[in-house]
C-alpha cells in the first residue's frame, strides 16, 4: 500500500510545482525572451489549458490501457516540456512548453486519483485525500523559496532543469515502484452489477459532488488569483508582507488538512462537508462586513480552513461510485474544476467585478448551492454497492 501512496503523492505534486516554481524567475524570463511580464502571465492559463486537454483523454486511456502507462508517459512529457521551456529563446516557444507541461501534469493528476480509488475504500480514501491536500498546500510555499535559492547562483533555466528532474523521478517511480491497479476482473457476484455501462457519469450523486468540488476549487483559485490585489493594493501590504500572509494561510490549510483524518474518526463525512461550506459562508459574510485588515485576514483564513476540511471528503465521495471507470471519473472532475474555476474568474474580469466582490460572490454562491446539494442528494444503495476496491489488480 505504501508504494501506491508514494506514487500517487509524487504524481499529484507535479501539478502545483509546475505552477509555482517558475514564478520567482518571471522578471528574468521576460527580459531574456524580450516579452513583458504581463504577456508571460498567460503562461498560467496556458498551463491549465494543457491540463484540461490531457484530462479529456487520460482518464479513458487509463481505464482501457492501465494507470501505469499513462503515469509514465505523463511524467516523460512533463520532463521533456520542462527542457523545452529551458531552451526557449522567444515567448511563443516558452508558452508551447508550458502547454505541454500542463499536458504531462494533467495526465499524472488523473492517474493519481484513479490509483487511490482502485486501492482504498471510502473511509481510508477520504483520509488520504485530506492528507494529500495538506501536502499539496506545502508546494505553493516551498516552491518559490526553492526557486529563489536556485536563482541566487544559477540562471532561470535551472528552474526548469529542476522541474525536468522532478519529471524523471516521478517517471522512475511509476516505472519501477508503481504496480498496475486497473481492475482486471471482478468477483463473480459483482459481474451483474459492476460494468462500465452501469457506472454512468450522469447520476445525481456524482453530479452533485462534481458541482460541490468544482465550486470549492473555484473558491480557492479565486482567492489565489485575487490575493495580490486584495493584500497589496487594497490593504496596502508590501511584497514581503504578502509573502508572509500567504505562507500563514498555507500553514492553516496544512494544519486543517492533516487534522481532517482524525476528525473523520469522530464525525461523519457529511458533517465535515457541512462544516466546510459553513466556513465558506462565514468567510463570505465576514469579508462583506469587514472594515479593518484584521477582520479581512480572519475571513481569508476561514477560506483556507473551509477548503481543507471538505475538499478531500467530497472528492472521495465523487469517486466512490466508480470501480471500473475511476480514470474517466477523475478526468471529469479535473476538467470541471479547471474549466469551471477559470470560467468564473474570466466572467468576473469581463464584467468588471472587483477582486473582493468576486471572492465574496463565489463564497456565498458556493456555500448555498453546496449545502442544498449535501442535504438533498445523499448516497443511495447503488453508490454503496460500487464502493469497493477492485477484486484483482495486476502485479
UniProtKB/Swiss-Prot annotation:
Recorded topology in the membrane: Multi-pass membrane protein
Keywords assigned by UniProt, alphabetized: Cell inner membrane, Cell membrane, Membrane, Transmembrane, Transmembrane helix, Transport
UniProt topological domain (Cytoplasmic) ranges: 1-3, 63-68, 114-130, 179-216, 268-270, 316-327, 378-395
Gene Ontology CC: one annotated term: plasma membrane
Family annotation (Pfam families): MFS_1 (PF07690)
SUPFAM superfamilies referenced in this protein's UniProt entry, alphabetically: MFS general substrate transporter
Keyword Glycoprotein applies: no
UniProt subcellular location: Cell inner membrane
Record flagged with keyword DNA repair: no
HAMAP family on file: MFS_MdtL
PANTHER family, alphabetized: MAJOR FACILITATOR SUPERFAMILY MULTIDRUG TRANSPORTER MFSC
Record-given protein name: Multidrug resistance protein MdtL
Amino acid at each position: 500500500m505504501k508504494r501506491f501512496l508514494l506514487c500517487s503523492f509524487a504524481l499529484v505534486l507535479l501539478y502545483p510545482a509546475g505552477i509555482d516554481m517558475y514564478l520567482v524567475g518571471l522578471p528574468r524570463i521576460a527580459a531574456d525572451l524580450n516579452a513583458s511580464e504581463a504577456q508571460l502571465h498567460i503562461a498560467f492559463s496556458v498551463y491549465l489549458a494543457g491540463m484540461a486537454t490531457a484530462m479529456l483523454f487520460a482518464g479513458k486511456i487509463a481505464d482501457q490501457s492501465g494507470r501505469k502507462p499513462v503515469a509514465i508517459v505523463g511524467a516523460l512529457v512533463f520532463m521533456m516540456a520542462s527542457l523545452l521551456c529551458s531552451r526557449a529563446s522567444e515567448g511563443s516557444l516558452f508558452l508551447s512548453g508550458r502547454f505541454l507541461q500542463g499536458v504531462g501534469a494533467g495526465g499524472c493528476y488523473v492517474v493519481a486519483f484513479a490509483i487511490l480509488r482502485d486501492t482504498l475504500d471510502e473511509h481510508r480514501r477520504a483520509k488520504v485525500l485530506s492528507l494529500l491536500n495538506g501536502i499539496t498546500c506545502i508546494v505553493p510555499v516551498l516552491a518559490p523559496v526553492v526557486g529563489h535559492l536556485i536563482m541566487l547562483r544559477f540562471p532561470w533555466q535551472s528552474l526548469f532543469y529542476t522541474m525536468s528532474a522532478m519529471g524523471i523521478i516521478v517517471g522512475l517511480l511509476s516505472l519501477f515502484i508503481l504496480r498496475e491497479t486497473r481492475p482486471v476482473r471482478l468477483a463473480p457476484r459483482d459481474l451483474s452489477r459492476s460494468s462500465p455501462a452501469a457506472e454512468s457519469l450522469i447520476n445525481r450523486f456524482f453530479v452533485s459532488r462534481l458541482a460541490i468540488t468544482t465550486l470549492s476549487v473555484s473558491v480557492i483559485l479565486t482567492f489565489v488569483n485575487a490575493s495580490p490585489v486584495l493584500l497589496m493594493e487594497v490593504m496596502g501590504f508590501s511584497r514581503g508582507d504578502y509573502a508572509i500572509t500567504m505562507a500563514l494561510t498555507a500553514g492553516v490549510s496544512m494544519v486543517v488538512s492533516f487534522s481532517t483524518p482524525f476528525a473523520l474518526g469522530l464525525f461523519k463525512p457529511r458533517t465535515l462537508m457541512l462544516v466546510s461550506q459553513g466556513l465558506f459562508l462565514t468567510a463570505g459574510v465576514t469579508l462583506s462586513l469587514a472594515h479593518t485588515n484584521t477582520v479581512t485576514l480572519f475571513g481569508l483564513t476561514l477560506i483556507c480552513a473551509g477548503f481543507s476540511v471538505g475538499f478531500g471528503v467530497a472528492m472521495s465521495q465523487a469517486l466512490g461510485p466508480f470501480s471500473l471507470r475511476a480514470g474517466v471519473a477523475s478526468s471529469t472532475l479535473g476538467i470541471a474544476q479547471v474549466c469551471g474555476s477559470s470560467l468564473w474568474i474570466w466572467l468576473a474580469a469581463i464584467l468588471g467585478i472587483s477582486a473582493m466582490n468576486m471572492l465574496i460572490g463565489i463564497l456565498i454562491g458556493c456555500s448555498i448551492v453546496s449545502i442544498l446539494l449535501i442535504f438533498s442528494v445523499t448516497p443511495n444503495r447503488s453508490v454503496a454497492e460500487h464502493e469497493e476496491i477492485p477484486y484483482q489488480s495486476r502485479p
